[in-house]
């Protein structure tokens, strides 16, 4: 069964799901932090870790240059034994992160924004069993293509768009999937009886139509 990680930068969400047995970990990224108005990374991380118990938590480096990425990665890793350092598969110039993995390989790493077959093949020889590779399956499927995977380590299905992606992640052999709070709220619909769901939908339409004159 695929493990579910909460994908959020909201301390309220993190606190809400910290003890939820369905949630096995937490991920964040710079875009999520920007959306939440986070400006002090260290203080935010301390707040997250104080609420998340011993569940794995991923924090991403902010730098684009490899030297500064390495420095930030080591600092982020020092925040706690359950911390995973997210490294983008390339910098903004398209230069691969792979050469940096030799220096940082002993850390808990989460290689993120992976989308191409070539990227997964390149990682195949470098990643270690304790690493995570985040394949942006949802974004790949937005382009009308199916995602790939990388088996030497834990593989994470990122950017899920719907509950069905949980089923696909299980079928494709992924270890982890990240879900936003709105998708977690929909997990109760998994395997719901469709006849009952149909009846509930008809009842909803009937109820909502009562105030409309014809």
Please provide the spans of the model-predicted regions.
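Conserved, mostly hydrophobic/aromatic
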Residues: 29, 85, 123, 169, ...
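Conserved N-terminal beta1-alpha1 strand-loop-helix module at the mouth
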Residues: 1-56, 64-66, 70
């Amino acid at each position: 069964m695929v493990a579910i990680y909460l994908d959020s930068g909201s301390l309220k969400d993190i606190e809400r799901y910290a003890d939820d047995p369905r949630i096995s970990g937490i991920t964040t990224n710079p875009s999520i932090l920007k959306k939440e108005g986070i400006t002090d990374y260290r203080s935010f991380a301390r707040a997250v870790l104080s609420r998340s118990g011993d569940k794995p938590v991923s924090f991403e480096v902010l730098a684009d240059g490899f030297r500064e990425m390495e420095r930030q990665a080591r600092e982020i890793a020092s925040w706690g034994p359950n911390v995973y350092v997210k490294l983008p598969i390339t910098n903004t110039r398209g230069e691969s992160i792979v050469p940096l993995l030799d220096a940082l390989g002993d850390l808990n790493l989460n290689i993120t924004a992976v989308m191409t077959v070539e990227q997964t093949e390149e990682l195949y020889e470098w990643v270690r069993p304790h690493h995570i590779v985040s394949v942006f399956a949802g974004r790949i499927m937005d382009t009308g293509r199916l995602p790939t995977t990388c088996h030497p380590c834990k593989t994470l299905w990122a950017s899920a768009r719907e509950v069905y992606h949980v089923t696909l992640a299980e079928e494709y052999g992924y270890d982890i999937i990240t879900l936003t709070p709105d998708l977690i709220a929909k997990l109760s619909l998994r395997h719901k009886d469709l006849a009952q769901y149909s009846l509930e939908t008809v009842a909803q339409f009937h109820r909502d139509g009562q105030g409309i004159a014809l």
